[in-house]
Each structure stands twice: as structure tokens, then as C-alpha cells.
Amino acid sequence: MTKKQKKVLIRIIVSAVLLAGIMIITKLVEINKWIQFALYLVPYLIIGYDILKKALKGIFKGQIFDENFLMAVATVGAVALGEFSEGAAVMLFYQIGELFQSVAVGKSRKNITSLMDIRPDYANVELNGKVEKIDPDDVEIGTEIIVNPGEKVPIDGVIISGDSTLNTSALTGESVPRSAKVGDEIISGCINLTGVLKIKTTKEFGDSTVSKILDLVENSSMKKSKSENFITKFARYYTPAVCGGALLLAILPPIIRLISGTGAMLGEWITRALTFLVISCPCALVISIPLSFFAGIGCASANGVLVKGSNYLEALSDTQYVVFDKTGTLTKGVFEVTGIYPANNFDKDTLIRLAAFAESASSHPISVSLKKNYGKEINIDEVSDIQEIAGHGVSALVDGKRVFAGNIKLMKKENISVECEHDEGTVVYVSCDGEYAGCIVISDVVKENSKKAISSLKKSGIDKTVMLTGDSKQAAERVAKSLGLDEYHAELLPSDKVDWVEKLLSQKSAKKKLAFVGDGINDAPVLSRADIGIAMGALGSDAAIEAADIVLMDDDPSKIALARKISVHTLKIVKENIVFALAIKAICLVLGALGIANMWVAIFADVGVMILAVLNAIRALKIK
């Protein structure tokens, strides 16, 4: 609890004890009305002074019709009619409901505002032989910073010295620490757990991951869902309407009774009108609906899914088509050796060694993957005369033998017959002294959770999953078949992807949504065009993250199905609260107008319904 909440709790306890004591005393002993008034006024003012103050401020500002005004009128009216205990009780239970709501909002906010804790206070920079703590805003690109164990990584960069494990839970929701070593990219907001790291910054603080996340979090509450906008408009007209209804209930029946000669019974009808006012307070709706979405967004944040507004969370539940980019989204976006097929008298170890040595001078991603798979240090004394053959591959002397490594064109050029029918990725053919040594297949590896992501989406009710890629048809077909995608389109330019999304948008149902999932800078246009743009946050480009409506902080595509599940359950809770609150209030309003429901029933219809609605709303925090 916050200090403010603790103070309110103390006021509630003091007021409740005093109220209970006074009620017992007045039941046992006959006390003068004015003394009763003075006694009940103490707990009433202890618990309700701030509500009365807010109501008066609202009147002076012209913002009359809110819950503070309703409570002030109802309780002051009850006290004026001599219903002292009821007036104090209404204010007491209203404050209990408000405290309950405040604690629930705090709980929901905790998951989101925990992201605020990722903001670093300083960066360790070596200046004139001394390590000094400076403001991250003052650190320039290319600066070498030091991150000690237990400190937050202040700015995005590359590790140039040291190895460690990182706690990324605040960003990704993943509790298992990740290892980090020299050459790895590192994003701000992580907590360094073990070793000392020296990092060369690649961005300014304002453009780093932590700054972008904080900006997104701060602006997320500005984008309201249709349900929230409906409740806001509803309350704008509903509250003045019920105030008018209560006024008519207090005036019209007594006038009619006077005309008919049956006695006005003004006090009775004013009591009914005040009961009507308490029942009609829209707290349950005004509080629980935004709270439900807030809790849903908080639940998503705790699982590493950053939703930029409740309107996007709501839209997820209506998603019909999910369209994926391939590289970096469904696949890792890095080349790896996926097959080694030696020929003639060569074995796998010899084949990969020949290829790695021949490619040793190249920084091409394919060359890097060959050297990585070889896994040993390359002795430069054993390789010489390296020549790059444009559009074909490389040639080199390895252990004094002429080695060629490249595509099929290179083999044909050297009149070397090959036997390799593997076309699932990029194929590197290798020959040694004119003899075919075999082939190595290099592919962009599918992410571990991609198949689970597609399967989960289909189970959740998604009608169609589509992949759009600029890669070859063979590579696209291999990935699409392995993942069980409904449709794929290959060899596309960024503009072609937009065209395909336009086409799919025209095919879907009018009320349904299309979500696009991507990570690259060339995905920004299509992310903006889709109904819902979902970006990869860990390795995704800044442009993609900025254009997206939802960000997956750990690049796990299976989190999309989880986000949709959170959306569907949140919407279900919202609808439950709307129906429940309106139904109970409608019944109690009729009973109040007929004089059947008293002020205690009104308290349940207002505070009781609000507490039940809030309890239901915070269930959105626990969706798994």
C-alpha cells in the first residue's frame, strides 16, 4: 500500500469504529436528535471531508455531474432528513470501495510501471584514467562504458570485453538469465548479474531500447478502447440524466399527491430520490472497464508483450488473419550450417575444414557460418592464395591443395561433376585438387517456438496464417510446410508486401482485423498498413518497433497467441462487468423508486457492485 492508501485505511478504520459505537449507543440509550447529529457528524467528516471538498470544487469549476457530487448530495440529503447513520454509512462504504479500487489499480499498474524501474540513473565512463558516473543522456555513440555486476545496462551497444549473465525479466518476462559474451549485442534495461562488461555504445540514450519502451508505456493509456470510449460517453449523459430523474422523483410525486389531496409525504419521496442517487452512481462501470484493460495490458507486460494502448488489446480479440514476415520473425535471421554431405573419400570434418579455410578471409554471413560450424581457430599458415571469384565463390590453397568453395556455377566452370540434391537452403559446393569433396547446406534456422506459435493461433480461432518474404520460393516453401502455414508468397519487395496485405484486407470480414508481424526496417510500411502491427522488440529495427502497435520484447512469436488470449479474456471480463453492473443497478433503481429498497440496499448496489466488478476486473492480471 502507498502512504496515501494507508492514510485512507486509517480513516476508514477510525470512522467505522466510531460509527459502530455510536449506532450501538443510540440503540441502547435514547439521545436527543441534535446530539445524535453532532455524534454522527464526527465519523461522517473524518471519512467524507475529501469527497465534499471535491464536490464543491467540481461545482465551482462547472464539472458538477460526477460520483463525488452524487455522494455529497445523497449523504448530505440523508443527514438533513435525520438519517444520520445511513448518511455516514454511505460515505464510509463508498470510501472502502474507492480504496479497494485504488489498490487494484496499483496492482495492475505494478506490472507496467515495473518497466519504469529499467531506466538507468547513470553510465560508468572512463575519463582521464578514472571511472566516473555520468548522465546517460550525455553519452555519445561509440563511447566505451563499464557495467558492473548488479547494475543496469544504460545504453544499447556491443560487448567488447568480459562475459556475464543478464537478467532480462523486466523487458521480456523471461526469468531465466541469459549469457552474454564478447561480440554480442546488448540492449539497455537488462541487469548485469555476474561479470564486469565493457560495452561500446551503438546508440544515444534517447534512441536506445529503454527510452523507447518508457515512451511507449507513458503513452499507452492515451489510446482508449471502444468499450472505454463508450463508458466515458455513457457516463457523460447518464449521470446528469439520473440526477434529473432523482429530482423529478423528489418533486413530482409529492405535487401529484398534494393535488389529489392524499398528503405530499415530501420526506419519504426525498429519501427515495436520495436512495435513487446512490444506486445510480456509475462507479462500477467507470472504474472497472478501464481497470480491466489496464490489468490486461499489465498481464501482457509481465509476459514480455508491450501493448501500446487498450484499443490494440481490444482489436486483437477480433483478429481473423495473421500475416508474418519470414526472416527474423519466424526464423532467427542468422545463417547456420544445417547439413554436411561429404562425397568420395572425404569425411564431414575434412569437408567443413576445407570450406572454412577457403572462406577464412571473408566476412560474408555464409563464410561466418562455415567458420562458426568448424569451431576451431584457423591457422593462417595453412591457407594461402585466397581469391574471390565474383558471383561464384572462392579459391584457396589449403595444405598446398587447390580448394574451390562456392555455387554450382563455380563447379561447372572448373568442370567438376557434383552429386548433391539438397535445395532447402543455400548450398556451398567444395572441391579439392579437382575432385568433388561434397556440399554444405546453409539455412536461416526456424525459431524453436515458431511452429507452436502457428499451432496456438489456429487453436485460438485464427482463420488464416500467411507468410510474406523476399526470400526464394524454395526457402519459403520449406519454412511454410514445416510450420503448417496456410499460405505463403515469396520473392517480394517491401512494396509487394503492402500490396498483399491490401489484398488480404479486402478478403477478410468487415468487422474482423488483420495483424502483421515483422522485425525489419522494410516492414515499417506494412506494419502501419495492417489493422494491428506487431514488431519484434529485441532484435527488431527501431522503425519497425515505432510503427508497430504491439511489441514482443523477447522476439518469441508464440507470445502472439498469448496476447490474443489475454485480449479475449479481458473483453469477456469487460462485458461481464457491463451486464452485471447495469442489471443490478436497473433492478435496484426500480426498487428504490418504489420505496422497497432503502439506503442499505443502495450501498450494496453502488459499493458492493463496484467491489465485485473490480474483483472481476483484476482477474485479467492472472490470465495465463
What do the PLM-derived regions correspond to, one by one?
Residues 1-14, 238:
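N-terminal membrane topogenic signal
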Residues 16-17, 229-260, 272-293, 575-604:
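Bilayer-spanning, highly hydrophobic alpha-helical transmembrane segments
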Residues 23, 35, 40-126, 138-145, ...:
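Actuator/coupling domain of P-type ATPases
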Residues 56-66, 103-113, 291-310, 618-624:
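Juxtamembrane helix-loop transition segments at the membrane interface in multi-pass membrane proteins
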Residues 68-72, 171, 271, 281-358, ...:
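Conserved catalytic phosphorylation-site environment of P-type ATPases
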Residues 148, 341-464, 473, 485-501:
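P-type ATPase nucleotide-binding
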Residues 245, 508-511, 548, 553-624:
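Membrane-embedded transport module
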Residues 398-400, 426, 432-576:
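Conserved ATP-binding TGD loop and adjacent catalytic N/P-domain core of P-type ATPases
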